Amino acid sequence: MSKILVLYYSRTGNTEKMAKAIAEGAKNVGNVEVELNYHVEAEELGKFDAILVGAPTYHHDMPMDMKTLFEEAAVKGISLKGKVGAAFGSYGWSGEAPKFVLEIMKNKFEMLVLEPPLLVRYEPDQNVLGVCRDFGKRVSESLIHDA
């Protein structure tokens, strides 16, 4: 059974809404286990087949919690090579954070990233939450087809 982590940080609740919808979509595909969380230790990352990171953009950057997690994983030599990576997030002005996450996943950890990231300006409406569910489903289906 494939394991997916949907990890997010959310100050306003917008990225959290996206994360929950993505996790819901991922769970709708059989033979996958989905963990939705706002915090994990770096050592835990290696146990997942896919890691989806929700990083809202604040002041043209990703949240410090996400930076710290990736830095710890790198320092501790956590191998994520070949795992599926994806990023999503809400933003008010610029939306860089999910792009930065994908760059780190691809260039530092050699993950197989799904591009482009899923970006939502401000609060996701019902249509956008449907897109989020489809995004999660797409990740789950990619794991099943690759298994």
Regions found by a protein language model. Give the residues of each.
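FMN-binding flavodoxin-like domain, especially the glycine-rich phosphate-binding loop
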Residues: S2-I4, N14-K17, A21-N37, K47-A147
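Aromatic-flanked redox-active Cys/Sec active sites in thiol-based oxidoreductases
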Residues: Y8-T12
